A protein has these predicted regions:
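Acetyl-CoA-dependent GNAT
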Residues: 19-102, 107-108, 121, 161-163, ...
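Extreme N-terminal starter segment of soluble prokaryotic enzymes
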Residues: 2-5
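Short alpha-helical
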Residues: 12-15, 96, 144-145
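Conserved beta-strand-loop-alpha-helix junction that forms the acyl-donor binding cleft
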Residues: 106, 111, 137-147, 164-167
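Conserved catalytic-core motifs of GNAT/GCN5-like acyltransferases
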Residues: 138-139, 151-171
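Conserved acetyl-CoA-binding loop-helix of GNAT-fold acetyltransferases
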Residues: 106, 112-125, 148-152
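Conserved GNAT acetyl-CoA-binding A-motif
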Residues: 127-138
């Protein structure tokens, strides 16, 4: 992993974060199957290998970060040699002592080098310092790299939300207890 620093975002960071490649490439997706019978409702997610890799667009407009970053409970930025290379946007629900990782982005050339892991661990530390009990990680069902990362870091599948994103993609939520 390159030498990185993770710190809270400041205003000049935002324009650079918007410019990062927010999309991902994948050979797999999680496919949802619904089975509704009398007295029974069953949802199943299956890992499906695609016939060829697809480029998955980010489910939100990257430009929305410009308006939303100050409304977020926290935005943590990863930098390398003074350049912004990734970020995570956090939403805190103090009532239930939970933090949701709403966005996690690492610029394409630096992916698969541990930066996403470092951002999630920094988000976990941020949540613990604020006395939260649970960390939840949100992602589209097509973002297979994020799904694998969630499992690798000990998150468990919690819930889904159909047509959650502006592009109508399914959101998956993985969570883990902090204390």
């Amino acid at each position: 992993m390159p030498q990185i620093e993770i710190r809270p975002a400041v205003s000049p960071d935002i324009i650079e974060l918007i410019r990062l490649d927010h999309s991902c490439k994948t050979n797999y997706v999680w496919q949802m199957d619904r089975n509704i019978n009398e007295g029974q409702f069953q949802i199943t997610f299956r890992e499906i290998r695609l016939p060829r890799p697809i480029q998955v667009p980010y489910p939100r407009l990257a430009e929305s970060l410009e308006d939303e970053w100050q409304l977020a409970s926290g935005v943590l930025v990863a930098t390398h040699e003074g350049k912004q290379i990734g970020y995570t946007r956090l939403t805190e629900n103090e009532e239930i002592q939970m933090v949701i990782i709403k966005d996690i982005v690492v610029d394409f050339p630096l992916r698969r080098q541990g930066i996403g892991t470092a951002l999630i661990l920094a988000a976990q530390n941020w949540a613990i310092q604020r006395n939260n009990r649970k960390l939840m990680f949100e992602m589209p069902s097509k973002n297979f790299p994020a799904i694998k990362l969630a499992f690798k870091l000990g998150f468990e599948f919690s819930v889904y939300n159909d047509s959650y994103y502006p592009n109508k993609d399914i959101a998956l939520f993985f969570s883990r207890f902090l204390k």
